[in-house]
């Protein structure tokens, strides 16, 4: 995004602004010197592996003492972007010092969320700045949370057959079976802001599917609001890839950059032939 105000940003700036105007339920969001920040009570068990979390929940009196593991926290970043959008051109040490000065009051934890770790979708400058920030942040009392593993496919092949030829026999067979099922879908790229997203019924259906995905998730951190999802659907600032079969929808936000194809599916849902499936 060459015109972006923020480093590390794969998405349009409009998505950052939308997050600030309509933060997740129970969150408070603001822009501090062009740094998106949000505050919420953070449960230290949130990111534990499910097996470990299950063992902890079986400990005696867990329901009583577990509340002691929740702390007021202020985060630099958003829950709507792949990586933390940081102000361009600001030295990491100065950024962290400013964050502490403006946001530390009343907070038990200061967290920089979704710091990229040598991302193939970012330029060298953004990656180098992120590495410097990750090195110095702990010494300044910050917690650094790396971004989740990014799913992407380098576009270094000329055909589907060439791509499949690189895979194992079982993987090729599985993907060919899935590709055949694609024939039952009518696939169309529908820009957000399209008239179809002006229908409240469509937006309510998609939001209901999102809530179903949220309910099935093992990790509950941010619950996107109806306003956020409706405004996103009616925005023409970025696009979605939407598969439609009859009255069924499958939607994801999508982008491509640096010779790679990446699809962000946070907060998105799929419904195909009457069944609901989560994608994360």
Where are these regions (language model features)?
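N-acyltransferase acceptor-side catalytic subdomain
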Residues: 1-280
């Amino acid at each position: 995004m060459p015109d972006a105000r923020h480093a590390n940003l794969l998405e349009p700036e409009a998505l950052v602004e939308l997050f600030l105007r309509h933060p997740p339920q129970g969150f408070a969001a603001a822009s501090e010197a062009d740094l998106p920040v949000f505050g919420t009570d953070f449960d230290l068990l949130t990111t534990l592996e499910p097996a470990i979390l299950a063992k902890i929940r079986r400990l005696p009196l867990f329901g009583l003492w577990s509340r002691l593991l929740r702390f007021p926290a202020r985060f630099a970043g958003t829950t709507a972007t792949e990586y933390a959008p940081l102000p361009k051109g600001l030295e990491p040490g100065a950024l962290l010092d400013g964050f502490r000065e403006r946001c530390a009051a009343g907070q038990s934890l200061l967290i920089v969320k979704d710091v990229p770790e040598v991302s193939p979708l970012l330029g060298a400058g953004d990656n180098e700045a992120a590495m410097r920030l990750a090195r110095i942040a702990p010494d300044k009392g910050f917690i650094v949370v790396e971004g989740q593993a990014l799913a992407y496919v380098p576009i270094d092949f000329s055909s589907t057959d060439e791509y499949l030829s690189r895979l194992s026999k079982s993987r090729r067979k599985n993907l060919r079976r899935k590709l055949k099922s694609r024939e039952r879908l009518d696939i169309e790229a529908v820009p957000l802001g399209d008239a179809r997203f002006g229908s409240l019924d469509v937006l309510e259906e998609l939001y209901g599917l999102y809530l179903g995905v949220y309910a099935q998730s093992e990790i509950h951190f941010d619950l996107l609001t109806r306003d956020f999802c409706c405004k996103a659907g009616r925005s023409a600032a970025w696009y979605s890839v939407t598969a439609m079969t009859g009255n069924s929808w499958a939607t994801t936000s999508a982008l491509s950059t640096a010779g790679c194809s990446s699809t962000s599916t946070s907060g998105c849902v799929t419904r195909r032939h009457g069944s609901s499936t989560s994608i994360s």
